[in-house]
Amino acid sequence: MRIGHGFDVHAFGGEGPIIIGGVRIPYEKGLLAHSDGDVALHALTDALLGAAAQGDIGKLFPDTDPAFKGADSRELLREAWRRIQAKGYALGNVDVTIIAQAPKMLPHIPQMRVFIAEDLGCHMDDVNVKATTTEKLGFTGRGEGIACEAVALLIKATK
């Protein structure tokens, strides 16, 4: 078994909506990013790549490459997952924690879990997504951006 950890953060800027966990969430602010700014899927992709010792999302999909401008993070996750599976790994489970003062994530979490399970080709029981605030402390608490942490457990597939 192998475990990976991922972290991502994006500052608010421009107009909404925002995309988190593949879900378009109405909000007056947008997120500044080279791709679609989906902190949840970026952190998850990093966790999966880390567990497989395959670097990180910036190595695989550099923000200096115009091909990834405005990229759909679900597509990036699926491509990273294909590469990880090709290395002989299967999914154990993933756990994602979104850190945001606003907007409220709870109504959107069920759909996030559906999208992640679809993209990884796994059962919903293998995907957990939760959200928390920082009780108005730090940059997320001041409403300056959104952060996310994720962990992933991979299992070496039998040969």
Curated annotation (Swiss-Prot):
Keyword Transmembrane found: no
Pathway: Isoprenoid biosynthesis; isopentenyl diphosphate biosynthesis via DXP pathway; isopentenyl diphosphate from 1-deoxy-D-xylulose 5-phosphate: step 4/6
Reactions the enzyme catalyzes: 4-CDP-2-C-methyl-D-erythritol 2-phosphate = 2-C-methyl-D-erythritol 2,4-cyclic diphosphate + CMP
Domain of life: Bacteria
Family affiliation: Belongs to the IspF family.
Known role: Involved in the biosynthesis of isopentenyl diphosphate (IPP) and dimethylallyl diphosphate (DMAPP), two major building blocks of isoprenoid compounds. Catalyzes the conversion of 4-diphosphocytidyl-2-C-methyl-D-erythritol 2-phosphate (CDP-ME2P) to 2-C-methyl-D-erythritol 2,4-cyclodiphosphate (ME-CPP) with a corresponding release of cytidine 5-monophosphate (CMP).
Protein name as catalogued: 2-C-methyl-D-erythritol 2,4-cyclodiphosphate synthase
Protein species of origin: Escherichia coli O127:H6 (strain E2348/69 / EPEC)
Lineage: Bacteria, Pseudomonadati, Pseudomonadota, Gammaproteobacteria, Enterobacterales
